[in-house]
From Swiss-Prot:
Designated name of the protein: Small ribosomal subunit protein eS4
NCBIfam families in alphabetical order: PRK04313.1
Family classification: Belongs to the eukaryotic ribosomal protein eS4 family.
Domain S4 RNA-binding: 43-106
Keywords: Ribonucleoprotein, Ribosomal protein, RNA-binding, rRNA-binding
Species lineage: Archaea, Methanobacteriati, Methanobacteriota, Methanomada group, Methanococci
GO CC terms in record: cytosolic small ribosomal subunit
Native source organism of the sequence: Methanococcus maripaludis (strain C7 / ATCC BAA-1331)
GO biological process, one term: translation
Pfam families: Ribosomal_S4e (PF00900), RS4NT (PF08071)
Entry keyword Ribonucleoprotein: yes
Length: 244
């Protein structure tokens, strides 16, 4: 028979390798709901509460905690236990005065890092389009779209945002309050490949017509390495613009 509708189940053995959960304890785990992040770059809230933060011993307890609305993602209450918490999301628990940033560790696993800055988050521009009225729509890595109103999209002084740049988005207002351009000399966070989870400075960018651009980076130890542009997330000039 044909598969009708979206899949609702996920076996643990088929879950993304960067999820921090035991594989052979049980057969199934939670499949994240479709939304702002892809499955391999996010964790459903239930796994965050139970397996990462260890606030619950089982799924039933974790669901009760989530359904109280005491857990916020990017300043908004999330009561759906399947909701994905993904890269650069700010997860807050106001009652416990705890705030976390979703990142990758050096093994590529999705992890949480404590942070003290909860009023803004970094988003990467993955695409941009001109919409009705000549205004510019920025498509960000976390699924959101931001409209930048301009009088003429062909003027470089108005169209300052480029694909690959990062923008600072206020929480929970969701408006752009800062901009970090992609380019040589900028500090980047590597989101894939052998050097995932590392911070490094961009040394050189090799533009290619048919394939992803190659970016040469240098980490704090002076080691140079290359990766593709989609794995490069700009976070600042000399230091990250947010606490990471």
């Amino acid at each position: 028979m044909a598969i009708k509708g979206p899949r609702k189940h996920l076996k643990r053995l088929a879950a993304p390798a960067n999820w921090q959960l035991p594989r052979k304890v049980k057969a199934f785990t939670v499949r994240p709901s479709p939304g702002p992040h892809s499955m391999d770059k996010s964790l459903p809230l239930l796994l965050v509460v139970r397996d990462v933060l260890k606030y619950a011993d089982n799924a039933r307890e974790a669901k009760k905690i989530i359904q109280t609305g005491k857990i916020l993602i990017d300043g908004l209450k999330r009561k759906e236990y399947k909701h994905p918490a993904g890269l650069m999301d700010v997860l807050s628990i106001p009652e416990m005065d705890e705030n976390y940033l979703v990142l990758f560790d050096e093994s590529g696993r999705i992890s949480l890092k404590k942070t003290d800055k909860t009023d803004a988050k970094l988003c990467k521009i993955v695409n941009k389009t001109v919409i009705k009225g000549g205004h510019i729509q920025l498509n960000l890595h976390d699924g959101r779209n931001q409209i930048v109103k301009v009088s003429d999209a062909t003027k470089a002084e108005e169209d300052v945002y480029k694909t690959g740049d990062s923008v600072l988005v206020s929480i929970p207002e969701q408006s752009i309050v800062g901009h970090v351009a992609f380019g040589e000399g900028k500090l980047a966070y590597v989101t894939g490949g052998k050097h995932v989870g590392e911070f490094a400075k961009i040394v050189e960018v090799e533009n290619r017509a048919l394939y992803s651009d190659i970016v040469t980076l240098e980490n704090k130890d002076g080691e140079k390495f290359k990766t593709v542009k989609p794995y490069v997330f700009i976070v600042g000039q000399d230091e990250p613009v947010i606490s990471m």
